[in-house]
Amino acid sequence: MKGQMIICLVLIALCMSVVVMAQNLRAEELEKANPKDERVRSFERNQKRACKDYLPKSECTQFRCRTSMKYKYTNCKKTCGTC
């Protein structure tokens, strides 16, 4: 009985390792099918940090002009400068 339990545990561990290996291979295949070079990844990371708070002229009030920076990064500029 004890031997059967050990064999069962070994089989379960083997099945789990096969599943994990298959998932890793699938992830590698997806990466090969849709490769992104470092420049593209860097650009995407920088776009997330960029200031994207553009106000249409219809919403340009004095208060909105002062508070038009959505993200507080040094490269953010107020985009409502023509109020």
UniProtKB/Swiss-Prot annotation:
Keywords: Cleavage on pair of basic residues, Disulfide bond, Ion channel impairing toxin, Nematocyst, Neurotoxin, Potassium channel impairing toxin, Secreted, Signal, Toxin, Voltage-gated potassium channel impairing toxin. GO terms for cellular component: extracellular region; nematocyst. Residues 1-22 form the signal peptide. Disulfide bonds join 51-83, 60-76, 65-80. The keyword Calcium does not apply. Residues 23-49 form a propeptide. It is found in: Secreted; Nematocyst. As a specific Kv1.1/KCNA1 blocker, may be beneficial for treating Kv1.1/KCNA1 gain-of-function-related neurological disorders, specifically pharmaco-resistant multifocal epilepsy occurring in infants. Residues 51-83 form the ShKT domain. GO terms for molecular function: potassium channel regulator activity; toxin activity. The record marks 72 as: Key residue for binding Kv1.1/KCNA1 (occludes the channel pore like a cork in a bottle), and important for the voltage-dependence of peptide dissociation. The keyword Signal applies. Specifically, dose-dependently and potently blocks the voltage-gated potassium channel Kv1.1/KCNA1 (Ki=1.6 pM). Moderately blocks potassium channel heterotetramers formed by 3 subunits of Kv1.1/KCNA1 and 1 subunit of Kv1.2/KCNA2 (Ki=56 nM) and weakly blocks those formed by 2 subunits of Kv1.1/KCNA1 and 2 subunits of Kv1.2/KCNA2 (Ki=14 nM). Very weakly blocks potassium channels Kv1.2/KCNA1 (Ki=2.24 uM) and Kv1.3/KCNA3 (Ki=1.23 uM). Very weakly blocks potassium channel heterotetramers formed by 1 Kv1.1/KCNA1 and 3 Kv1.2/KCNA2. Does not block Kv1.5/KCNA5, Kv7.2/KCNQ2 and the heterotetramer formed by Kv7.2 and Kv7.3 (KCNQ2/KCNQ3). Belongs to the sea anemone type 1 potassium channel toxin family. Type 1a subfamily. This is Kappa-actitoxin-Aer3a.
